[in-house]
Regions:
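Terminal, low-structured helical/coil segments at or just beyond the last alpha-helical repeat
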Residues: 1-6, 139-155
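Alpha-helix N-cap/N′ positions at the starts of helices
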Residues: 4-8, 24, 99
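Short helix-capping/linker turns of helical repeat alpha-solenoids
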Residues: 4-5, 16-17, 21, 35-38, ...
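Hydrophobic face of amphipathic alpha-helices that form TPR/SEL1-like repeat modules
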Residues: 8-18, 41-50, 79-86, 115-122, ...
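Short, charge-rich amphipathic alpha-helical segments embedded
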Residues: 30-43
Length: 155
């Protein structure tokens, strides 16, 4: 008997989402997450954040994003940072938002770099530093974040 493949469960979950079968997607993502596949955990978080196939639950979304982030899934770190930034499902904490955006950026998630740049630009949760902001905008732009590219052009 072949060993369960978390990537296959993840791919089946994505196909289920494309078919708008969120209940089935949840089952596949749970299996992928149980097998320590960060994308599965992250997508479970998205289902809970959006209330797709499950009752909307931002606390559970934060839990699954945290699990995804621990498994080095950049988008999970980014999404967790966004929850902390907005105080959704967790207590608002700009320092934690900066931490998770930084972790996302380190994992080459362009949105994490871009949002970290905004925090440095505004001095939210970190000491205001326009030079660091530009460095993060530049990294985000190189990773395909168009908003960060625009922010650099405006300077």
């Amino acid at each position: 008997m072949a060993k369960p493949n978390p990537e296959e469960f993840f791919d089946l979950g994505v196909k289920s989402i494309e078919a708008k079968d969120y209940i089935q997607a949840k089952k596949y993502f749970e299996k992928a997450c149980d097998l320590k596949y960060g994308g599965g955990c992250g997508n479970l978080g998205v289902l809970y954040q959006n209330g797709q196939g499950v009752e909307k639950d931002l606390t559970k979304a934060a839990y699954f994003y945290s699990k995804a982030c621990d498994l080095k899934e950049g988008l999970g770190c980014f999404n967790l940072g966004a929850l902390y930034y907005n105080g959704k499902g967790v207590e608002k904490d700009l320092i934690k938002a900066a931490y998770f955006y930084s972790k996302a950026c380190d994992l080459k998630e362009g949105m994490g770099c871009g949002n970290l740049g905004v925090l440095y630009y505004n001095g939210d949760g970190v000491k205001r530093d326009s030079k660091k902001a530009d460095q993060y905008f530049s990294k985000a732009c190189k990773l395909g974040n168009q908003e960060a590219c625009e922010a650099l052009k405006e300077k």
